[in-house]
């Protein structure tokens, strides 16, 4: 079945295409700048795709048993969890990019900073697309919509790359990737809107707002740290503390997802303590 090859294709096609076209239309140094950031994004992407792989069997089972409403609730919960997780990653990467890149890659790779700041938000699009593909399209047999969304993204990416890479190099490739994932996501939302209340996804905006506030806090603290490993560590800790406090505040105001996460965490900790 062709659909079995699409998940593999959709994970790698855009950035693989980006690097190939960068080599054709720009310089080899621009490929290097892009390649380093691609590695970072791939690490983050691994956690995102893992969620889809874990939830696919459960979603398929619910649909097969006719429990559509329960399946829809699971999709909303997964969408919210992905947004909660990605908000920390996206705004964290953006806020520390100008420290992270010189510390890990060296000052000669400073052009990678702009690429990282552009590609980081793409994690939102990848995560949301992954949830909808693996928990809605695949379990409900909408294979063709899945394939079209991937091919549509590939076409958009190619067109934008041809237009922008000769002018903006790696930045142009990053813009092409974002455009591709955005159009692909919009197409999927259009496909599912008749069977699913997509307005429920807007409850996730609170996590994006929390991530943005965290980023502002890190940017303020960044004025007082050096471009060093210690400075980078201080920024990461600052961001983690701010985001954790925000999550506690949201839970206090009865955020259902965070209340569930905290309940599971308490039970897990209590169980482990009792075992010892």
What label would you give each PLM region?
Residues 37-79, 83-86, 133-139:
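Helix-loop junctions and terminal segments of transmembrane helices
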């Amino acid at each position: 079945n062709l659909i079995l090859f699409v998940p593999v294709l959709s994970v790698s096609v855009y950035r693989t295409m980006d690097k190939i076209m960068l080599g054709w239309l720009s310089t080899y140094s621009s490929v290097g700048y892009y390649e380093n950031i691609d590695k970072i994004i791939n690490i983050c992407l691994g956690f995102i795709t893992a969620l889809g792989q874990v939830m696919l069997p459960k979603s398929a089972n619910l649909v097969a048993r006719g429990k559509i409403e329960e399946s829809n609730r699971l999709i909303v919960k997964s969408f919210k969890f992905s947004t909660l997780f990605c908000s920390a990653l996206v705004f964290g990467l953006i806020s520390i990019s100008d420290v992270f890149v010189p510390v890990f890659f060296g000052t000669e790779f400073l052009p990678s900073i702009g690429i990282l700041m552009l590609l980081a938000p793409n994690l939102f699009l990848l995560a949301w697309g992954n949830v909808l593909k693996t928990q809605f399209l695949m379990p409900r047999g909408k294979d063709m919509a899945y394939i079209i969304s991937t091919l549509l993204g590939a076409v958009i990416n190619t067109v934008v790359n041809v237009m922008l890479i000769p002018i903006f190099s790696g930045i142009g490739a990053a813009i092409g990737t974002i455009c591709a994932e955005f159009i692909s996501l919009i197409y999927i939302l259009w496909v599912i809107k008749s069977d699913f209340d997509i307005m429920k996804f807007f409850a996730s905006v609170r996590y994006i707002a929390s991530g943005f506030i965290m980023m502002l806090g890190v940017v303020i603290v960044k004025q007082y740290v050096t471009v060093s490993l210690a400075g980078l560590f201080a920024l990461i800790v600052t961001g983690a503390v701010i985001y954790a406090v925000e999550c506690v505040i949201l839970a206090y105001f009865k955020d259902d997802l965070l209340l569930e996460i905290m309940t599971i965490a308490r039970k897990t900790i209590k169980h482990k303590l009792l075992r010892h």
